[in-house]
């Protein structure tokens, strides 16, 4: 603290007088670690902290906060300011008796490629002293950064998380990043320690608007008359800075409020404004003040010339404690926010669910601080249950780490509660609007972990995308209203929606949900039978023009659309039986038998299923050697996800859609022809998601001859498609091959080259990557029906995490007995099938209870 203080500065120091203990603050438990990233594998690590549909800020691999994406749009690598020392940061002050104080930024060292720039500042905080060593531990959503430095008398573990509790979308949708700085005194004497967070008030600056100065620097803008207020509540043990604005348009997507809070009461000091930033003096003034004694105060009047002029004043919140020799203490901070004006792909504001529940970041901070221990316990219960299971670590990693997509700007919830999503997100805007059906068909994390949200997506599809004639827009418009008359249909997307509706009905057991949407489901499937449609002659085979997830139209029967169609017929048959619609059930059954047999007899070539191309006008089969073949087809290619419909059928409990031996042979062929141990000699004319000496599954291979112009993505490799093949292998007992594929994927996301918490396709945090969760139920053949009140698993010794979207827990199996433990929600079961034996339960197990079955 500087010697000359203004009145506000004196007032801020009074909090230091009573004590510096803060013994009642939240003390994080020991967090699990699934994956460790050493100092050579940190550069791309960015773990998103935020709730479902709230946006996030990421905890970087070396401890910095990066990717500030809390204002309704993506903002990769956006730090709220022009690259420099003004970006948000946390710093630590230490003072040992009879020793000079030391101050450093709480982050690890610069990387080797961060040393060159036309102004010598290619990275934020380039001029701040840093710790010399960093590493990162993760078990999503828990991230931990360990900072050490031989010159510092402390080691620091930065812990960051946001509550993630399957089955509880509200707790999992809190707009908060929780940070705890665990500081350990590594000396043999007492130590003064202060930790301080500093953030400029960037309300209005969401990273979408920049101007370029004379040097070429990109200067973000949008802030207007922003100011910061210090707030406290002794009853709830909270001190905070609230970030507000008087000038940003209240209809701007970047309008809202934020809060940086601490649960410390003693030893708290703060700044609500900053010095004039000419020649970067504001950081200089802060650093001098903080480094003096670990206590801060607002700049004096003659220094803070920018007050009233500075549109984005920097605020700082600091807490100071005394650590005994060898002692560890926690310095906790909570960043909360509310930015209600989401537009997504609409021209008008559609809003956010979370901001209707949490409109005031200050109130949110109070709520979170009062319940943080409970939120941590609930999240740990989930993560520890999964990590303690007997699944291979790489399966846990792929399933767990890809849940980040649910918290990214890919996903949002409308004020009505409906969940929607982009396909993924680019650096500054969403990628491919409309909850695209043929992309979201692949992911299964939402239905198995957040059933209510999955059902809301089915409501959107049936109520706002489906036309009277049964055609469905595969991209829904916003605001939600009558289906868009200018729309496109997708065969795979629409057939998948029938299967997904069946899945949500089965997992929820809500017969009213089915009854109220049964007519819509019939129209969805029935559209395939329109004249000159996908199956216009109603023979169980799709011959028509089939738009699909390859962003082209396939002409003629092919396995990708064919198995989606077979799955939709099976799902519709089961729903029709439940609705006592005998005629429709019979029709679906007949078409399924015809279509399945035809595909096995006419598309299976002895190794895999192929595509028989038809004339787009006549629907007649064409000679594969004809020069008049339409472009962008599959033909005789071996497609990585040709069995995607079978993948979904297994997950839904609908059985085999084709000959079982053909299914297995096809997966063996995919492994034989599509898997590459090394991509360094592979030619790819499109996007490269696998490069050099990395391994993975190709989208398509051509053992029987390639078309001159195949479908666009044939030479690529994308994780969501790879997971469907790997999961199919699990169902066929090809465990070694499945794990080889999944390991190849996750090895590419090693923190050095790619972010372990974002698997991209057409954009970061791509929705299809959540197909990785399917390996969890597939590994133990998990099936659950709330309609029939049944659960079944393979008889496989070990402890296995299970979930159905509403309840979750573990099932432990050994030679003599099985223990079914419910950890969250209520589970009603009539029978439990383990292997080939059925056991009657006829009871409801609430959370915390278990059933023991003698085998």
Describe the predicted segments one by one:
Residues 427-471, 515, 519, 552, ...:
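Active-site core of glycosidic bond-cleaving carbohydrate-active enzymes
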Residues 47-48, 57-61, 67-71, 81, ...:
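Short, solvent-exposed loop/turn and secondary-structure capping segments
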Residues 1-23:
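Bacterial Sec-dependent N-terminal signal peptides
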Residues 64-66, 72-78, 83-89, 96-159, ...:
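Non-catalytic C-terminal accessory modules of carbohydrate-active enzymes
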Residues 22-31, 36-41, 45, 144, ...:
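Acidic/polar, glycine-enriched structural segments that form the non-catalytic walls/loops
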Residues 91-97, 101, 105, 111-116, ...:
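Aromatic-rich carbohydrate-recognition surfaces in CAZymes
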Residues 22-110, 248, 389-390, 398-402, ...:
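Beta-strand-rich N-terminal accessory domains
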Residues 170-172, 180, 267, 284, ...:
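The feature captures the catalytic groove of carbohydrate-active enzymes
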